[in-house]
A protein has these predicted regions:
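N-terminal secretory signal peptides that target proteins for export/translocation
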Residues: 1-9
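Structured segments of extracytoplasmic/periplasmic soluble domains
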Residues: 43, 47-50, 63-66, 83, ...
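C-terminal segment of classical bacterial N-terminal signal peptides
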Residues: 19-29
């Protein structure tokens, strides 16, 4: 190979890497990739957003680590405001299994997710919504 070929080949490899990398999504590089959205979330999406805006229900964006009943601009039930819990995997699992049993008097019109695998997938998705 000629000396010109030796200089061009590394440049071509770098160029291909740059072009190929430019077509890749940037979210994983910044830790923003959401977990796969489970089908059971379709029930949640009727009332809840994942983009930071409130609907019939409060946004679920940033749910993990947030005290229950504290999203600005959303009017919570007295039960939810006074629940005294911080949303983590255990609290969400208990709540999603049976919302009324976990926080009696909350007004979310949802009976729960009985299947533990569906709850686990839903919780993983909710955890990824930062």
């Amino acid at each position: 190979m000629s000396s010109t070929g030796c200089r061009v080949l590394p440049r071509a490899v770098i160029l291909m890497a740059v072009i190929g990398g430019a077509s890749m999504p940037l979210a994983p590089c910044f830790g923003q990739e959401a977990a796969p959205r489970p089908e059971v979330f379709n029930q949640c999406a009727v009332c809840h957003s994942t983009d930071g805006s409130n609907g019939t229900g409060p946004t679920l964006k940033g749910l993990f680590g947030r005290p229950a009943g504290t999203v600005l601009g959303f009017r919570y039930s007295r039960a939810m405001r006074g629940a005294g819990i911080v949303w983590d995997a255990k609290a969400l699992d208990d709540y999603l299994r049976s919302p009324q049993d976990f926080i009696p008097g909350n007004v979310m019109p949802f009976s729960g997710v009985a299947d533990s695998a569906e709850r686990a997938g839903l919780i993983a998705y909710l955890r990824s919504l930062k």
